[in-house]
Amino acid sequence: MKKISNKCLDLVKEFEGCRLTAYRDEVGVWTIGYGITNSDFKITKKIIRKGMKISKATAEKWLEESLNKKYLPLVLEYDKQYNWDQNELDALVSFCYNIGSIKQLTADGTRSKTVVASKILQYNKAGGKVYRGLTRRRKAERELFLAKAAPEKKPVKKKSNETIAKEVLAGKWGSGKERKKKLKAAGYNYAAIQKIVNKLCKK
């Protein structure tokens, strides 16, 4: 299951800002923390109203839960078409948190990633007016979207103790303390392997 990373959290925090006392936003909606509103009641379990205060830890907890439970699924709806890498996923969840959906951005999954990246910049208006903050945010999201994500590490399948014991006898792991150090560093049970080595030597 794909998840957001700290890159997404940091991006959202940077542009949303954090206010620990409830306030009304530009359109009169009660808001608190990193842009949390009463539409997030399933997460907060509280009604946001005048005079409400929360801690920074609560603000961060609510943000992370909102991103993972509410907005990540909206981005993953299109994962079959796009197979988002980590950076693309993080950028789009941030976008979705601000805009509410990526359906229009992706033309319901019909646009290429290249076109999606170019279209991100167009969402810098509110009420038909261009906002500098939204322009900066869209540029940051597009930059993250286009950044090459680190390749996913595939787990290395460990060899059996019997196979390693035979390699030890063949001299592949050195001898004495050096062998012990190498085996432990590779995550093998030195004592168990040595026991098998001793048995093989007696045959």
Please describe what each predicted stretch is.
Residues 1-21, 27, 36-39, 58-65, ...:
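Long, amphipathic alpha-helical surface segments
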Residues 12, 91-96, 119-120, 168:
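Short alpha-helical scaffolding segments that buttress acidic/His motifs in well-ordered protein cores
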Residues 28, 88-91, 115-119, 192-193:
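Residue-level detector of well-ordered alpha-helical segments, enriched
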Residues 30-47:
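Short, surface-exposed acidic-centric catalytic microdomains
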Residues 45-81, 86-103:
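Alpha-helical segment that forms one wall of the substrate-binding/catalytic cleft
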Residues 138, 142-152, 186-203:
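Repeat-associated, polar segments at repeat-unit boundaries in modular proteins
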Residues 161, 169-180, 188-190:
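Extracytoplasmic Gram-positive cell-surface binding/anchoring modules and repeats
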